[in-house]
Regions:
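Generic structural signal for hydrophobic core residues of well-folded globular domains
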Residues: 112, 129-133, 196, 200
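N-terminal cysteine/histidine-rich coordination modules
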Residues: 1-83
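A structural motif
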Residues: 92-100, 162-165
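Short, charged amphipathic alpha-helical segments flanked by flexible coils
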Residues: 73-86, 134-166
C-alpha cells in the first residue's frame, strides 16, 4: 500500500483499520519517526513509523512503512511511503471459508462503521457457514444449538452465540424495542463470526496442511 503524506494528512488508505469506513480522512498525530535502514534490499530501505487519527471514528492507528533511502541513508521528512503494517491490521475474511461466507464476512468487516449493516452481513456469513455444514432449517440460534448437540460446534460456542445479538430479528434477551444495532453489537457478532470460521474451516485446513507436510517429509 503506497500512501502520500501531505498537509499532515494521509492519502491512499482504502479503509480505516479501526472502523472500516472507506477512503477515510486520517490526520497525522505527532512526527514521522525514523526507525532504521535495512541493507537487505537494493535500493536500501529507510523505515519509519507514525500515528494517525481517523476523523470518522476518532481512533488512533500506528503505521510502519518505508521509502528508498537516499545517499545519506534517509530523508528527514518522507512524503511517500510504502506501508507494510498497521496496528490494528486491516481485517480480512479468511480464504479458507466457503465463497459465500467469505464474501459476506468481508463485507461485514468493511461495514464496521455502520453497525446495522455489519450485523446483517455477519449474520448472513454465519448462515452460509451453517448451511455449508448441512444446517439449513430454523433460526440461527436453533441451528447453532443443533450443531452443538451434534458435536460440530462446542457447547461454549453455542453459549457465546446466545450471549450476543445475531440479528435484528433475534434479540439477545426480551428487548421490548430494537432501535438499531450498536457498535458493541457489531463488534461482538464480528468476533463470533470470525471465531466460527476459524473453528469450522481455518483450523482444520491448517491441520490438514501440517499433516500433508509431515507426510511429505516422511517420504523423503
Amino acid at each position: 500500500l503506497s500512501i502520500s503524506l501531505l498537509d499532515e494528512e494521509l492519502y491512499g488508505i482504502k479503509r480505516c483499520p479501526q472502523c472500516g469506513i472507506a477512503h477515510p480522512l486520517i490526520r497525522l498525530l505527532g512526527p514521522i519517526t525514523f526507525h532504521y535502514v535495512t541493507e537487505q534490499y537494493y535500493p536500501h530501505r529507510a523505515y519509519y513509523y507514525f500515528t494517525g487519527r481517523c476523523s470518522h471514528c476518532g481512533h488512533v492507528i500506528l503505521f510502519n512503512g518505508y521509502q528508498n533511502a537516499d545517499g545519506n541513508g534517509r530523508e528527514q521528512k518522507p512524503e511517500h511511503l510504502q506501508i507494510e503494517r498497521s496496528y490494528p491490521d486491516l481485517d480480512s475474511a479468511a480464504e479458507e471459508l466457503p465463497e459465500k461466507a467469505q464474501k459476506f464476512l468481508q463485507q461485514a468487516l468493511e461495514s464496521r462503521h455502520a453497525p446495522d449493516g455489519a450485523l446483517m452481513l455477519a449474520a448472513s456469513a454465519i448462515d452460509a457457514m451453517l448451511k455449508d455444514k448441512g444446517y439449513r432449517d430454523g433460526t440461527l440460534f436453533a441451528r447453532i444449538g443443533k450443531s452443538s448437540e451434534d458435536g460440530v460446534l462446542t457447547e461454549q460456542m453455542a453459549k457465546w452465540a446466545h450471549a450476543i445479538r445475531l440479528s435484528a430479528n433475534e434479540p439477545r434477551h426480551a428487548d421490548d424495542e430494537f432501535d438499531g444495532a450498536t457498535q458493541d453489537d457489531a463488534d461482538q457478532i464480528l468476533a463470533f463470526t470470525k471465531a466460527l470460521g476459524e473453528y469450522l474451516y481455518v483450523l482444520p485446513a491448517k491441520v490438514e496442511r501440517w499433516k500433508n507436510k509431515a507426510g511429505d517429509e516422511e517420504d523423503v
